[in-house]
């Protein structure tokens, strides 16, 4: 069997994914651990935010909405960030679907990861106690003719302004504060993320 480049990159990691065996009336049934957790409406967003991963996350959210549009979805985030367009496809789907999406930061939520963390349903955005959050402005690098570079520079400024507006909406911070605080990398602890409005609470245990 031949693999695409993306499948080939994913294949070694898939070999390490544990399998869960369940007894049913029809006998034994095995799932990989992520598929089993999907039955509990849990989705993982881990690693770089890129098109392949974003498509998987979007597909899972749409599937869970079709199964039950009234039950919450739980999105666990451990990400250094990634591609803006890929992240925005996840963001728009989170806002589009009917179920509330509860976001939980474990490890880190940086850049686009932080943006998606704060885009969860109000009151249902959570940090685990030793996680960290980092916000900053969009990054971009371009080559080509001067005119093309100018076009791309204008576009990234538009994207920056749009993301700042959305971040202000979700955090409750003034737009001026968001513009100032995202000018450079800004790291926040779990409790600082609550104070800033990026999340609503820090959970140390399920109790």
Swiss-Prot record:
GO terms for biological process: protein quality control for misfolded or incompletely synthesized proteins. It comes from Pectobacterium atrosepticum (strain SCRI 1043 / ATCC BAA-672) (Erwinia carotovora subsp. atroseptica). InterPro entries: ClpP (IPR001907), ClpP/crotonase-like_dom_sf (IPR029045), ClpP/TepA (IPR023562), ClpP_His_AS (IPR033135), ClpP_Ser_AS (IPR018215). The keyword Phosphoprotein does not apply. The lineage of its organism: Bacteria, Pseudomonadati, Pseudomonadota, Gammaproteobacteria, Enterobacterales. It comes from the Bacteria. Keywords: Cytoplasm, Hydrolase, Protease, Serine protease. Its EC number is 3.4.21.92. It catalyses: Hydrolysis of proteins to small peptides in the presence of ATP and magnesium. alpha-casein is the usual test substrate. In the absence of ATP, only oligopeptides shorter than five residues are hydrolyzed (such as succinyl-Leu-Tyr-|-NHMec, and Leu-Tyr-Leu-|-Tyr-Trp, in which cleavage of the -Tyr-|-Leu- and -Tyr-|-Trp bonds also occurs). Its main location: cytoplasm. This is ATP-dependent Clp protease proteolytic subunit.
């Amino acid at each position: 069997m031949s693999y695409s480049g993306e499948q080939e990159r994913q294949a070694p990691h898939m070999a390490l994914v544990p399998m869960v065996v369940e007894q049913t009336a029809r006998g034994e049934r095995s799932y990989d651990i992520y598929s089993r957790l999907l039955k509990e409406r849990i989705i993982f967003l881990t690693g770089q935010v890129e098109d392949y991963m974003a498509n998987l996350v979007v597909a899972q959210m749409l599937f869970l909405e079709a199964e039950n549009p009234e039950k919450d979805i739980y999105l666990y985030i451990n990400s250094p960030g990634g591609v803006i367009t890929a992240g925005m496809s996840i963001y728009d789907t989170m806002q589009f679907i009917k179920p509330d999406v509860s976001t939980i930061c474990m490890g880190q939520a940086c850049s686009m990861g932080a943006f998606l963390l704060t885009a969860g349903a109000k009151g249902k955005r959570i940090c685990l106690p030793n996680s960290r959050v980092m916000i900053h402005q969009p990054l971009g690098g371009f080559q080509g003719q001067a005119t093309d570079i100018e076009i791309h520079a204008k576009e990234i400024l538009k994207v920056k302004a749009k993301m700042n507006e959305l971040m202000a909406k979700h955090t409750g911070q003034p737009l001026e504060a968001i513009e100032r605080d995202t000018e450079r990398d800004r790291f926040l602890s779990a409790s600082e993320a609550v104070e800033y409005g990026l999340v609503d609470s820090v959970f140390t245990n399920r109790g």
